[in-house]
C-alpha cells in the first residue's frame, strides 16, 4: 500500500472519530507529536514531585504530611503511566529521560519557581 493510501485511511479514521491505537499506522509527524506531548506531561508529573517532596518534612501537621506523601506518590504514578503510554508509541523511557536531561524535552515551567512557604507549595502543586 502506498503512503498516500495509508494517510487517507488514517485521516478517514480521524474524521469518523475512530480511536487510533498505538500499533495502528500513523504519519511519523503525528506519532512524534504524540510522543513529545505525552513525554512532556510525564516529565511534568515527575518534576512536579520535587517541590512537593521538599516540603514533606516541613509540613505544618502530621495530617498534612500524610496527604503530601500521598500526593507525591500519586504524581510519580501518573508519570510512570504516561511514560508507559509513550513507550507503546515506539520510544524508550531511557530516550525520554535522556531528552529531558539534555534539555531537548521540556516540562511545565511552574516547577521552576521557588516554594519558600507552605502556601507557595500549595499554589505550585
Where do the model's predicted regions map?
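Non-heme di-metal
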Residues: 1-125
